[in-house]
Amino acid sequence: MTSAEMTSPNNNSEHQAIAKMRTMIEGFDDISHGGLPIGRSTLVSGTSGTGKTLFSIQFLYNGIIEFDEPGVFVTFEETPQDIIKNARSFGWDLAKLVDEGKLFILDASPDPEGQEVVGGFDLSALIERINYAIQKYRARRVSIDSVTSVFQQYDASSVVRRELFRLVARLKQIGATTVMTTERIEEYGPIARYGVEEFVSDNVVILRNVLEGERRRRTLEILKLRGTSHMKGEYPFTITDHGINIFPLGAMRLTQRSSNVRVSSGVVRLDEMCGGGFFKDSIILATGATGTGKTLLVSRFVENACANKERAILFAYEESRAQLLRNAYSWGMDFEEMERQNLLKIVCAYPESAGLEDHLQIIKSEINDFKPARIAIDSLSALARGVSNNAFRQFVIGVTGYAKQEEITGLFTNTSDQFMGAHSITDSHISTITDTIILLQYVEIRGEMSRAINVFKMRGSWHDKAIREFMISDKGPDIKDSFRNFERIISGSPTRITVDEKSELSRIVRGVQEKGPES
């Protein structure tokens, strides 16, 4: 099967669509609606270090490995030896492909001893060399890295532009699908440094590496794919050991199946409050101030999975593995034994150790390798530090979307800013994404500090509306009765309600009579 078979136009369609060539770059074919237009040139533009050369090499490598389509790589910057050496870090053996006649690297890099142009500048010789290589190797894919170097080597930009037009026209005449890289000065400035490169190409892809808050965030944007459709806007990506990995969040569809099967939270009373437990493929958010018992709920959640011989992964971003093991053991949970049985995996990392896209990739990789039935993230708020609201929301969408796709039950925690009193759950930008929200908070009752728990929201199920007392003992969580004689608990200012004892006794008797004798 060729790279164009699944994206070729329908012969019966009224309008002839443009066939596309799949790049097999993770996520790119989704946002480009099938890949790059066949027989056309695509300009990949970005500042230094954004991954332009990597994109151009991966485009060729995937074509050779996945579809047995030979390629030609034209380098104006690095030597072929450097390119082959750098590609090895991604597990790509370009030297072997060269020896097998599947890849040809055309060295047009500058002479280290300098060069002097005598007479008029043209690319006729280079064009003929490229043409010869394409014909000899029957190449369908061509990458040129980079156009900027041509401008830097020669001063006459108008002449260089003319020659680039000639080069692109010749490649189009041959029918090669071409990727050309160019450098830009600013992340959100002109598309290319010399302002003419984008007019030479049919398509433009922009790579960015923007500093947001305290972290850098890589994004890819398809600015244009002439004559064909594509998804608009920026999409986050990361560079892994296997190359570029784009997260096409906008391409995600709400097509996952919904299950009526319930799973236990690990706390019997909480299961009762949720109408019998969490739905199997749901995402639960436990939110509250520090110390309200969120990590304890997470621990019970993963312990229950292991007790039922199901696998679980705990992603911890606030506590070390040793601390998690110690705290769990103090509540009667032996996480080490669960790990030995290969039922539990604990992944600990500082949020600042990587960007959100890198953390998302790690989470997806761990899920793919370990195949858990449940995951827990403690906590999302730690990952939100130093990043924009949009980047954080995209991260949460990526995690929840992947968990639902794999039919995994997920319990995430979020630490609220306010120690007591009401706090807006919607400020975290994740309340609408999750299926169930458990609200934990501190309340002051009769001069003493107490904890309260409430099932704030649960999609598709009845749930208890009461605000109940939540106690933590050496045996773990213990949910008591509701604060029946108090109101305004969520606001942080509980007020005692005067209760007429006779009326209250009548209410209790009436409730018992309505319930009737147990069968």
Curated annotation (Swiss-Prot):
> What the protein does?
The KaiABC oscillator complex constitutes the main circadian regulator in cyanobacteria. Complex composition changes during the circadian cycle to control KaiC phosphorylation; KaiA stimulates KaiC autophosphorylation, while KaiB sequesters KaiA, leading to KaiC autodephosphorylation. The Kai complex controls chromosome condensation, leading to a transcription accessible chromosome during the first half of the circadian cycle and a compact, less transcription-accessible chromosome during the latter half. Clock output pathways impact the RpaA transcriptional regulator.
Q: Outcome of mutating residue 114 to A, per the record?
A: Extends the period of the circadian rhythm to 27 hours
What switches on its expression? Transcribed in a circadian rhythm with maximal expression at 12 hours and minimal expression 12 hours later; expressed as a kaiB-kaiC opperon, this gene does not have its own promoter. Autorepresses expression. Negatively regulated by labA. Non-phosphorylatable kaiC mutants still down-regulate the kaiBC operon.
Q: What is this protein called?
A: Circadian clock oscillator protein KaiC
Q: Which PROSITE patterns match?
A: KAIC
In the UniProt entry, what is the domain comment? In the homohexamer the 2 domains (called CI and CII, joined by a linker) self-associate to each form a 'donut' layer; the compactness and local conformation of the domains varies over the cell cycle and impacts function. CII has the autokinase and autophosphatase activities, both CI and CII have (weak) ATPase activity; CI has the clock pacemaker role. The CI ring undergoes structural changes driven by ATP hydrolysis that together with the KaiC phosphorylation state regulate KaiB binding. In the homohexamer the 2 domains (called CI and CII) self-associate to each form a 'donut' layer; the compactness and local conformation of the domains varies over the cell cycle and impacts function. CII has the autokinase and autophosphatase activities, both CI and CII have (weak) ATPase activity; CI has the clock pacemaker role.
Effect noted on mutating residue 409 to A: In kaiC10; extends the period of the circadian rhythm to 27 hours
Q: What is the effect of changing residue 108 to E?
A: No longer binds KaiB, no formation of KaiCBA, still phosphorylated
Activity regulation (UniProt): Interaction with KaiA stimulates autophosphorylation, KaiC interaction with KaiB sequesters KaiA, preventing it stimulating the KaiC kinase, leading to autodephosphorylation. A KaiA dimer is sufficient to enhance KaiC phosphorylation. Interaction of KaiA with the A-loop stimulates autokinase activity.
Q: Which residues bind Mg(2+) 2?
A: 295, 318
Q: Where is this region: Linker?
A: 248-260
Locate the active site.
77, 318
Recorded superkingdom: Bacteria
Q: Which family does it belong to?
A: Belongs to the KaiC family.
GO BP terms: namely: circadian rhythm; entrainment of circadian clock; negative regulation of circadian rhythm; regulation of DNA-templated transcription; regulation of phosphorelay signal transduction system
In this chain, where does the modification Phosphoserine occur? 431
Known catalytic reactions: L-seryl-[protein] + ATP = O-phospho-L-seryl-[protein] + ADP + H(+); L-threonyl-[protein] + ATP = O-phospho-L-threonyl-[protein] + ADP + H(+); ATP + H2O = ADP + phosphate + H(+)
Q: What is the effect of changing residue 273 to I?
A: In kaiC8; extends the period of the circadian rhythm to 37 hours
UniProt-listed Enzyme Commission number(s)? 2.7.11.1, 3.6.4.-
